[in-house]
Amino acid sequence: ERLREAFEQDGQRVTSIELDNFLTDREYREQKGIFTQGKQALHFELFKQSLVDITQGKKISIPRYDFVFATSSHDLDGHLKPDGAPIEIEPADIIFIEGNFPFLIPEVVHLIGIKVVYLTDDPVRMKRKWKRDIDYRKKYEPTYFRNRFFKDQFIMAEIAYRPQLEVCDICVDTSGSA
C-alpha cells in the first residue's frame, strides 16, 4: 500500500492484478487432482493474454474468483459465465502482479519487468493474510486459518518462496533476520 501511494504521489498510474482471480473452479481442480500452485490451476491463456494486453497499454477484463464459493466468473474455456462479473483493469505505468508464483512461469516471465519478492516475519504476514482471507475474501473460519497458516509455511517456502528468491531481481526483506 505504501509503495503504491509513493508511486501515485510521483504521478505514476498504478494498478494490480491478483493472480488468484485466474483460478479455475475448485471443484474442477479437485476432480482433476490439480494443486493450486501452477498454471494448470489457472485460466492460463487468459492470464498470459491479459499480461500482454495490459503491458501494451490496453484495458483488460479478467476473471473474478469467488473465494466463498470457490468458483470463477469464467468457464474452463475462458469465457464469461452467464452470471459472471469480470474485473476491469485500466492500463497503468506500474502494474503489480500479486501472487505466490507469477514469475516462476516461463511463458510469462518475460512480461514482468522487475521481479520483487517481499519477505516479512510471520506476525506481519499473518496479519496481512488475515485481512485478505478472513476480512475481505471471507475465505476461512479463523481457527482453521491460524492452523493452516502455520502448517503451510514450510510447504509454501519450498514450492514458492525459495524458487522465487533464486530468480527475483530484488528481495525486500523486512523480517527480523534481515
Positions of predicted regions on the chain:
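Conserved nucleotide-sensing/catalytic segment adjacent to the nucleotide-binding pocket
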Residues: 15-19, 24-80, 94
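A conserved segment at the C-terminal end of the G1
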Residues: 1-11
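Short, glycine/acidic-enriched loop or turn micro-motifs at the edges of active sites
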Residues: 21-23, 101, 122, 176
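Small-molecule kinase domains that catalyze NTP-dependent phosphoryl transfer to phosphate-bearing small molecules
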Residues: 136-178
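Conserved beta-strand scaffold positions in the cores of enzyme catalytic domains, especially
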Residues: 14-16, 115-117, 169-173
